[in-house]
């Protein structure tokens, strides 16, 4: 019992420590509000019109910054649905049999009705030993959260949360509004910073706040601009941070552009179809996080597919609908021999991509 108790104490201590970066950002944000709204706008600005304009614009950016930051922190990451979890009997088989063909057969049977297109580097079905589930496309296991996260991008210590399918849009808006917030502060604070620096204004308590505020805003603007630009590039290519470091592996091999549908569709996959919600931290992303449209460079004859533009869906035995996955239009000549998703009851003997490949081995990606 002692090790268990000490382990629980360590876990609680780690949970507390994980909040330190969030507390730091919150304190810095609170100080910046005091320094800008009080010391700069109310104390140092003499022009009433300038005060009003700066305070209105500042509070708008401040509100959007806090809102998007809050949503990024407290939106729970989405986990794979029950269709991807192994049944009790399948778990028993995996535990009873030695690793080998028996394990592969269990995974093949479990995955035959699931819309999974990606594989491990060795071509195996992506299976998580920790969560005991077959990983959906773009899903990864987070060692910090100790869960499989749908469309995991990365675990961010500054929000103490996993950034994935459920909150990636919020994270992007958080970066955007924090960058605008810092740029606005630096731009409107610059003239007062110069005047204090050259002793053009009296040496008051506001001097420290105004000068340090400019340094902090300028410093964060540089770091945020590079990070925001990088994630804009990721969105334009329909990649996650993990996929940028390691290209996704499909049945035919690696494909760095496997999920890219073109700039417009890539944007809409994150921000949604209704543009009125794009700048608001409300969930509007497309899909369910378990299945994603993909453009495959080469058609896999064993992999069922549906031409782009068709509204067909696939159903598993639990009546969970998954959208069909189109190929690139340049590969339309391959569609003549392609198969379509069918209900498991209609074709019980056929599996999904790679299910009949005896070379598949089970790996645990963490």
Swiss-Prot record:
<dbReference type="GO" id="GO:0022407">
    <property type="term" value="P:regulation of cell-cell adhesion"/>
</dbReference>
<keyword id="KW-0256">Endoplasmic reticulum</keyword>
<feature type="compositionally biased region" description="Polar residues">
    <location>
        <begin position="337"/>
        <end position="347"/>
    </location>
</feature>
<dbReference type="GO" id="GO:0016409">
    <property type="term" value="F:palmitoyltransferase activity"/>
</dbReference>
<keyword id="KW-0564">Palmitate</keyword>
<feature type="region of interest" description="Mediates localization to plasma membrane and recycling endosomes">
    <location>
        <begin position="298"/>
        <end position="366"/>
    </location>
</feature>
<feature type="domain" description="DHHC">
    <location>
        <begin position="126"/>
        <end position="176"/>
    </location>
</feature>
<dbReference type="GO" id="GO:0042803">
    <property type="term" value="F:protein homodimerization activity"/>
</dbReference>
<protein>
    <recommendedName>
        <fullName>Palmitoyltransferase ZDHHC2</fullName>
        <ecNumber>2.3.1.225</ecNumber>
        <ecNumber>2.3.1.-</ecNumber>
    </recommendedName>
</protein>
<dbReference type="GO" id="GO:0005789">
    <property type="term" value="C:endoplasmic reticulum membrane"/>
</dbReference>
<feature type="compositionally biased region" description="Basic and acidic residues">
    <location>
        <begin position="326"/>
        <end position="336"/>
    </location>
</feature>
<dbReference type="GO" id="GO:0007416">
    <property type="term" value="P:synapse assembly"/>
</dbReference>
<dbReference type="GO" id="GO:0140439">
    <property type="term" value="F:protein-cysteine S-stearoyltransferase activity"/>
</dbReference>
<dbReference type="GO" id="GO:0042176">
    <property type="term" value="P:regulation of protein catabolic process"/>
</dbReference>
<keyword id="KW-0967">Endosome</keyword>
<feature type="topological domain" description="Cytoplasmic">
    <location>
        <begin position="1"/>
        <end position="15"/>
    </location>
</feature>
<keyword id="KW-1133">Transmembrane helix</keyword>
<keyword id="KW-0770">Synapse</keyword>
<dbReference type="GO" id="GO:0019705">
    <property type="term" value="F:protein-cysteine S-myristoyltransferase activity"/>
</dbReference>
<feature type="short sequence motif" description="Non-canonical dileucine endocytic signal">
    <location>
        <begin position="334"/>
        <end position="335"/>
    </location>
</feature>
<feature type="active site" description="S-palmitoyl cysteine intermediate">
    <location>
        <position position="156"/>
    </location>
</feature>
<dbReference type="InterPro" id="IPR001594">
    <property type="entry name" value="Palmitoyltrfase_DHHC"/>
</dbReference>
<dbReference type="GO" id="GO:1905751">
    <property type="term" value="P:positive regulation of endosome to plasma membrane protein transport"/>
</dbReference>
<feature type="topological domain" description="Cytoplasmic">
    <location>
        <begin position="229"/>
        <end position="366"/>
    </location>
</feature>
<dbReference type="GO" id="GO:0150054">
    <property type="term" value="P:regulation of postsynaptic neurotransmitter receptor diffusion trapping"/>
</dbReference>
<dbReference type="GO" id="GO:0019706">
    <property type="term" value="F:protein-cysteine S-palmitoyltransferase activity"/>
</dbReference>
<dbReference type="GO" id="GO:1903539">
    <property type="term" value="P:protein localization to postsynaptic membrane"/>
</dbReference>
<feature type="transmembrane region" description="Helical">
    <location>
        <begin position="16"/>
        <end position="36"/>
    </location>
</feature>
<feature type="compositionally biased region" description="Polar residues">
    <location>
        <begin position="297"/>
        <end position="316"/>
    </location>
</feature>
<feature type="topological domain" description="Lumenal">
    <location>
        <begin position="191"/>
        <end position="207"/>
    </location>
</feature>
<dbReference type="GO" id="GO:0005794">
    <property type="term" value="C:Golgi apparatus"/>
</dbReference>
<comment type="similarity">
    <text>Belongs to the DHHC palmitoyltransferase family.</text>
</comment>
<dbReference type="GO" id="GO:0098978">
    <property type="term" value="C:glutamatergic synapse"/>
</dbReference>
<keyword id="KW-1003">Cell membrane</keyword>
<keyword id="KW-0012">Acyltransferase</keyword>
<keyword id="KW-0812">Transmembrane</keyword>
<dbReference type="GO" id="GO:0098837">
    <property type="term" value="C:postsynaptic recycling endosome"/>
</dbReference>
<dbReference type="GO" id="GO:1900273">
    <property type="term" value="P:positive regulation of long-term synaptic potentiation"/>
</dbReference>
<dbReference type="Pfam" id="PF01529">
    <property type="entry name" value="DHHC"/>
</dbReference>
<dbReference type="GO" id="GO:0014069">
    <property type="term" value="C:postsynaptic density"/>
</dbReference>
<dbReference type="GO" id="GO:1904719">
    <property type="term" value="P:positive regulation of AMPA glutamate receptor clustering"/>
</dbReference>
<dbReference type="GO" id="GO:0005886">
    <property type="term" value="C:plasma membrane"/>
</dbReference>
């Amino acid at each position: 019992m002692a090790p268990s108790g000490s382990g629980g104490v360590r876990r609680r201590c780690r949970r507390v420590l994980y909040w330190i970066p969030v507390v730091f950002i919150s304190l810095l944000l609170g100080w910046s509000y005091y320094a800008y709204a009080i010391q700069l706008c109310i104390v140092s600005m003499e022009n009433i019109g300038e005060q009003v304009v700066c305070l209105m614009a500042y509070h708008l950016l401040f509100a959007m910054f806090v809102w998007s930051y809050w949503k990024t922190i407290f939106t729970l990451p989405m986990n794979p649905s029950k269709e991807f979890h192994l049944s009790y009997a399948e778990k028993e088989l995996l535990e009873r049999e030695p690793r080998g063909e028996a394990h592969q057969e269990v995974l093949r049977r479990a995955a035959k009705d699931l819309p999974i297109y990606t594989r491990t580097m060795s071509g195996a079905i992506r299976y998580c030993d920790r969560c005991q589930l077959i990983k959906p496309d773009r899903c990864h296991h987070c060692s910090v959260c100790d869960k499989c996260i749908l469309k995991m991008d990365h675990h961010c210590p500054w929000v103490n949360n996993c950034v994935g399918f459920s909150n990636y849009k919020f994270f992007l808006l958080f970066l955007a509004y924090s960058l605008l917030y810092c740029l606005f502060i630096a731009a409107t604070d610059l003239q007062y910073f110069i005047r204090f620096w050259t002793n053009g204004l009296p040496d008051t308590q506001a001097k420290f706040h105004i000068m340090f505020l400019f340094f902090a805003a300028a410093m964060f603007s540089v770091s945020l601009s590079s990070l925001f630009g990088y994630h804009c590039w990721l969105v334009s290519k329909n990649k996650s941070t993990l996929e940028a470091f390691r290209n996704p592996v499909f049945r035919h091999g690696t494909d760095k552009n496997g999920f890219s549908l073109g700039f417009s569709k890539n944007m809409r996959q994150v921000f949604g179809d209704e543009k009125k919600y794009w700048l608001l931290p409300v969930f509007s992303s497309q899909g369910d996080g378990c299945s994603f449209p993909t453009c495959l460079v080469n058609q896999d004859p064993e992999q069922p597919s549906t031409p782009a533009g068709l509204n067909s869906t696939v159903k598993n035995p639990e009546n969970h609908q998954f959208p069909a996955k189109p190929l690139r239009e340049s590969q339309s000549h391959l569609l003549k021999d392609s198969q379509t998703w069918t209900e498991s009851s209609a074709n019980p003997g056929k599996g999904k991509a790679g299910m009949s490949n005896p070379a598949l081995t089970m790996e645990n990606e963490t």
